[in-house]
Amino acid sequence: MVRFMYALRKRRLSLLLAMSLLVMCVASVVSPPPQALASGSGGIERVFTDKARYNPGDAVSIRVQAKNGTGSSWSGAARLEIFHLENSVYTSSQSLSLTNGQSTTLTFTWTAPSTDFRGYFVRIDAGTLGQGATAIDVSSDFTKYPRYGYISEFESGETALESKAKVDQLAQDYHINAWQFYDWMWRHDKMIKRTGGSIDSTWLDLFNREISWSTLQNQIDAVHDVNGKAMAYAMIYASRENYSPLGISPTWGIYEDSSHTNQFDVDFGDGSTYLYMSDPQNPNWQNYIHAEYIDSINTAGFDGIHVDQMGQRSNVYDYNGNSIDLSTRFSPFLDQAKSVLSANNPARDNLTYNIVDGTVNGWAVNDVSKNADLDFLYSEIWYLSDSYNQLKNYIEQLRANGGNKAVVLAAYMNYADNAGTRYEAESASMTNVSTNTNHAGYTGSGFVDQFASTGDKVSFAINAPEAGDYSLVFRYGNNTGANSTLNLYVDGNFVQKLYFFNQSSWGTWKHDAWYQVPLTQGAHTVELRYESGNVGAVNLDSLTLGTFDEHSVRLADAMMSASGATHIELGDDNQMLPHEYYPNRSKTMRSSLKNAMKDHYNFITAYENLLFDSDVVPNDTGSQFVNLTGVSASGDGSANTVWYINKRTSDYNIVHLINLLGNDNQWRNTASQPSFQTNLPAKIYIGADETISDVYLASPDLSGGETQELAFTSGTDAGGKYVSFTVPELKYWNMIYMKRTFSVPANDIYEAETAIKSNVSTNTNHAGYTGSGFVDGFSSTNDGVSFVVKSTASDDYALRFRYANGGSDATRDVYVDGKLAGTVSFKSTGSWSTWSYGEITARLEPGHHTIVLWQTSGNTGAINLDHLDLDKTYIWQFDRQIVSVPAGYRITFRTGLPGWVHWGVNGWTGVTDTPLRSNGSLDGNLDHETSIGPFATGTAVDVTFLWDDNNNGILEPSTDRWEGTDFGINVS
């Protein structure tokens, strides 16, 4: 993780922040809370597996913890059933007899199938005793479906059994299969501390936290015991202060000036602690730090490296004064790191890298996600992708750039919110202090003033609704010019000295003074006392029991998973991550959220193939595809709507429904419980060549995640072909998946009259059309035709729209899977019975795609649309002059000028002039295109260009400018 958000934007960190993090390190040492029950009901208290992930053919142990609380003896059977999606693949049953109050654990064993990379849902049904569920991931490589957690505490005194317990809890309850070991190292530039060649038993990290080597080893062993992977946190360019004795040279550094006076650094404000930055592309730095990576793997037993950075830096110079673009220097470093790690041990060469402040086309995003040799993509989200839809679009860009590599997001929930039950200081019991209202921004009716002398005290009477960890968060003001301290007592016992940091004014309120404590259920007393040794003064506004908001977490996790990403959020001691500094525990989960997370992680594990596989294609989310009766719906995550996300795989159509009713469009902030829906009518429009055989619903919120089959009807109306069904219940997130077959039309010609139609009609009153007719009335804003097509290969495709235009020239925008591909020109054909083609080229991966031809407010004219012809093509450009194409492919020419492709075959026979049309590209060198072909094997295509410099659209061979060079393309 980026060490602190502030470090992204500033060179120096204040002493205030550095000290606050030191306090947090101390404060986070607490006993673990009682374990949350896994997905189960009634007497089935917990269902779990013994591993986080299984290799094909492994023995899978499924354990069921049951307790009879019925009030009398119970006898019956516990039935196990395992599903892959909607299909049952295994059943087993065990007899069970329990007296009232008796507990037992059943163990079922199943052999994982030989098919790699599949998720399975596990159901336990014990009739009147209860039901339960878990999930199984059969994958030989965790990077296909990384469910990433973290460990951040490595203190002495933690036994091997305690290390195993904290890892087992995350593996069993949440299927976490990889752990980021955060800030485990001694120094960022010398990770393992040695004395006289021997590894020290303990060392202190950057913030003086104790790191125990034996604890670290025990935790790594525990991760391996559950078939998980341990990833060592490291920086891409950071060295601590006094780095020269380690052999690191300032000549490797990056600087703020061309005279190498100021090396980029992070100053922690205590006058002695710094992180200095080296050039990631400097080979000497690479050799040095990559050796540290290898030492971490070979000596500590890590399985890979999690590489971090500090975010955007501009105006960067190397030691020699050369200006460098830092954003382009990460990929070469990472490629070399991967090569070095693989050469050292290919079984322990996993590598990922933090793309900081991720957003569509953000800093370093495209270079790293497209080019770096990473096993999965990882990105920390700050404030450039605040809305649900922005983050969805970013996830889709990462997956597209990375060839569908897995994506993990570090997205800190409720980050700026002081969420949880609040107790106002002015309503607490006070000793020797007063209340006031003379500084704006307080909550409640005022705040406690004059908290500045020995004997001053504020005592809160609080209620813990359940046993567990509680984060005590104090909101305060301090403008004394220095940091202040108070002592914290819980139930009369001294707990910790807390720091309250100096702010710019008394009207600046902060809630960064916190401490986490274990509490029993019921009443407790929390006191702040000013005692001997305390300093300064504070205004105290409130105490909050810092708590994650369940509604926002469930909605955000639904959005990320439905968009194709997982979320690093769960860590040691069953904690959730509130902050970029992982030991921060200023918020906690209550049991209801823990149970919801168990259901969520069961769900994303069981249905990983429909959520994260490479054949899951994001489709267009326009309103023409989904019709929900009785609620506001949107395809872009608009506030107060049911948000639908459409996808397709090779076998299924998928519609995710995320319930934002009653909430805004921001994922990070606290939310309200959405308005739950029952019996929601849905009509889903599909392609003319698709046939739906079954409709299923699965949700982490319903029946423990088990699939249920829905009754449906099929039909056709003015909008096109559809299936309709009733959604029985929608809480936070439903996934509708529909079993589908697809019949590719002859010659890949998709007829417009049978496609999905928006505000247009069909007709047959002009001859020359193909199929049964054509689309008419395509002439107004928000008119459109939407096709569902199948591509068989990763290739460029010419999207050729056959049309007639008896009026003025027209344009239409083309969207491929919801992303603007360009603008097609539909020149006048002179008659409504004269048909021609307008076209644009797009890259398609194998799978099922939506192609939408739409009239936006920026488009003009009217057309009749006959069909879409989907043809594979090779692209010729002046900066990429291809000389051969396969038989059966078209050739697309992209240029920066209007004119004609003047071409013939086999020595200029059959000469033809094909016009180049504007495609709407923002690249002035590629904003015109056309295609020719396809051609048979052995054909030699001869090509040159005639440029329409006067832009009158009239072919004038004696007037227009010839290119003057002939180009040849062979067909093989």
Swiss-Prot record:
First and last residue of the signal peptide: 1-38
Gene Ontology MF terms in the entry: carbohydrate binding; glycosyltransferase activity
Enzyme class: transferase
Catalytically driven reaction(s): cyclizes part of a (1->6)-alpha-D-glucan chain by formation of a (1->6)-alpha-D-glucosidic bond
InterPro entries found in the cross-reference section: CBM6 (IPR005084), Galactose-bd-like_sf (IPR008979), Glyco_hydro_66 (IPR025092), Glyco_hydro_b (IPR013780), Ig-like_fold (IPR013783)
Keyword Flavoprotein among record annotations: no
Keywords from the named record: Glycosyltransferase, Repeat, Signal, Transferase
Pfam families reported for this sequence: CBM_35, CBM_6, Glyco_hydro_66
Gene3D superfamilies from the UniProt entry: Galactose-binding domain-like, Glycosidases, Golgi alpha-mannosidase II, Immunoglobulins
Activity-pH dependence: Optimum pH is 5.5.
CBM6 domain location: 421-546, 748-871
Entry-linked PROSITE patterns: CBM6 (PS51175)
UniProt keyword annotation of Glycosyltransferase present: yes
EC number: 2.4.1.248
Role noted for this protein: Produces cycloisomaltooligosaccharide from dextran containing 7, 8 or 9 glucose units. The enzyme is specific for (1->6)-alpha-D-glucans (dextrans) and, without activity toward (1->4)-alpha-D-glucans, such as amylose. It also has no activity on oligosaccharides, such as amylopectin and pullulan, containing (1->6)-alpha-D-glucosidic linkages at branch points.
Family to which the UniProt record says this protein belongs: Belongs to the glycosyl hydrolase 66 family.
Subunit details: Monomer.
Protein name: Cycloisomaltooligosaccharide glucanotransferase
Organism per entry: Niallia circulans
